[in-house]
Amino acid sequence: MTILVLGGRGKTASRLAALLDAAKTPFLVGSSSTSQESPYNSSHFNWYEKTTWDNPFAEIGKHGLQPISAVYLVGPPTMDMVPPMIQFVDLACSKGVQRFVLVSASNIEKGDHSMGQVHAYLDSLPGVEYVALRPTWFMENLLEDPQRTWIKNESQVVSATGEGKIPFISADDIASVAFHCLTEWGSHKTEYIIQGPELLSYGQVAEILTSILGKKITHRSLSEAEYTNILVDEIGMPADFAAMSAAMEVDVKNSPQETLNGSVEEVTGNPPRFFRTFAEHEKQKWV
């Protein structure tokens, strides 16, 4: 069994690759930014270049790997993700892939827009196993710009969530769940909403950062339109995807999550990481 890991340098895919490597599980990384310096077997894969989709299946022989039987499915950051992802799923199935682990989002139900439609398509395929991972907000988003720069230089976190609370999750915990879903075979057509162990507003996140960094961090609350513009102007996110991301933030404000589940511990045997633990470990990146 060889596992294809798409989104090779992404937050969860890079961590999943490290777990698979440590476990000596055969895998191949598919990424648009492959490098000869990569420590892992890799193949050029670009969602926007259909001619690259066959590369991982054609190149496994040169890496001394068995045929690909499972795929970690991370889509492109665009609202037009559904047609290419479904086409790739069909290609992968024709090559003998038996299982997919799809990365979706906690507030995108099966059959909804974007990843929700891919989720529904996987569910409709006979003889195909899948697990849809639906994580909440990543703690690691605070380590990336513009949030990292805002924390470091402007002493603030920025969101459109108001005082809505989020069960922030670490990418390490998501990768651990994905690892178990990919390597522990069984009859699966299921989903996991992946949450952290506590509900926090961005205001509470700011308070935790204040206590760790030794300087006052505040929460700047934006409107949906203001946050959309920031995602486009400061991150370079496509406008339609930025609008979807901002709308998801506003959903937190209007319909806050008030319950927690134990999915991480259920799947991995270990509880998820608390935000304070994460922030203490990463604090030098905000100094």
Swiss-Prot record:
User: Which catalytic reaction applies to this protein?
Assistant: festuclavine + NAD(+) = 6,8-dimethyl-6,7-didehydroergoline + NADH + H(+)
Top class in the EC scheme = oxidoreductase
Pathway given in the UniProt record: Alkaloid biosynthesis; ergot alkaloid biosynthesis
**Molecular functions per Gene Ontology:** oxidoreductase activity
Could you say which EC number(s) this protein's record lists? 1.5.1.44
**Swiss-Prot/TrEMBL keywords:** Alkaloid metabolism, NAD, Oxidoreductase
Q: Which InterPro entries match?
A: Ergot_Alk_Oxidoreductase, Ergot_alkaloid_biosynthesis, NAD(P)-bd_dom_sf
GO BP field: indole alkaloid biosynthetic process
Do you know which NCBIfam families this protein is assigned to? ergot_EASG
Q: What does this protein do?
A: Festuclavine synthase; part of the gene cluster that mediates the biosynthesis of isofumigaclavines, fungal ergot alkaloids. The tryptophan dimethylallyltransferase ifgA catalyzes the first step of ergot alkaloid biosynthesis by condensing dimethylallyl diphosphate (DMAP) and tryptophan to form 4-dimethylallyl-L-tryptophan. The second step is catalyzed by the methyltransferase ifgB that methylates 4-dimethylallyl-L-tryptophan in the presence of S-adenosyl-L-methionine, resulting in the formation of N-methyl-dimethylallyl-L-tryptophan.
Query: So what family is this one in?
Result: Belongs to the fgaFS/easG family.
The entry's protein name is Festuclavine synthase I
Organism whose genome encodes this protein:
Penicillium roqueforti (strain FM164)
